[in-house]
Design a protein with these regions (language model features):
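Nucleotide/phosphate-binding catalytic cleft detector across ATP-hydrolyzing
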Residues: 2-177, 183-193
Length: 193
């Protein structure tokens, strides 16, 4: 295998990578994408939008992502299209989502990471295996060393400091830009979603 990202052969490199890489949590939403970096908090909260310039021979170029793409909405020339690659909390356009994620991760880490980041991404509770694989593949293609998925209600409960390990249930209502999820958590897992 190549690189310092996916599979280290030497324990020393694994240990070193923990100190050099960024641990990132991503809420990849229909309306906005938030990125949390360990030790820094939320470093990015931008619209899940991409400005794409059409080129000759079906070649396109990403002109802007996030806030910069939103600023172009309604003002861009005809050859630049503003798109939202996420629909109802899941990936609608894999290639554009991958490129958007890569650019937002680079922006959030200020392009300084020596080792690819370890990433946790929130996914809708009702997402299919195919949709989850698309998110995983997109994050790896964007340069992540490792990717873990967590259901949005579970992430919300952890963020709110709820006692998710207790036998008593905790109810979460996650109202997003494209979906609303309700989850009941008990004994460290989702009892209902």
């Amino acid at each position: 295998t190549s690189g310092l990202g996916r599979n280290f052969r030497y324990p020393m490199f694994r240990l070193l990578s923990r100190f050099l890489s960024n641990d990132i949590a991503i809420d990849l939403g229909t309306a906005n994408t938030l990125i949390f970096v360990r030790g820094k908090g939320i470093v990015l909260d931008e619209p899940s939008m991409v400005a794409i310039q059409s080129g000759a021979g079906n070649k396109s170029k990403i002109m802007a992502v996030g806030t910069e793409a939103k600023k172009m909405q309604g003002r861009a020339p005809r050859n630049i299209e503003i798109v939202r690659p996420m629909k109802d909390g899941v990936i609608a356009d894999f290639v554009i989502t991958e490129r958007m994620l890569g650019m937002l991760i680079k922006k959030a880490t200020e392009g300084r990471s020596l080792v690819p980041p370890r990433v946790v991404i929130c996914v809708p509770g009702g997402s299919t295996q195919v949709e989850r694989k698309a998110i995983l593949d997109s994050a790896f293609a964007a340069g992540a060393a490792s990717v873990h998925l967590i259901e949005e209600p579970m992430a919300a409960a952890l963020g709110a400091g709820l006692p998710i390990e207790d036998a008593a249930g905790s109810m979460i209502v996650d109202i997003g830009g494209g979906t609303t999820e309700i989850g009941i958590l008990s004994l460290g897992g989702m009892a209902y979603s």
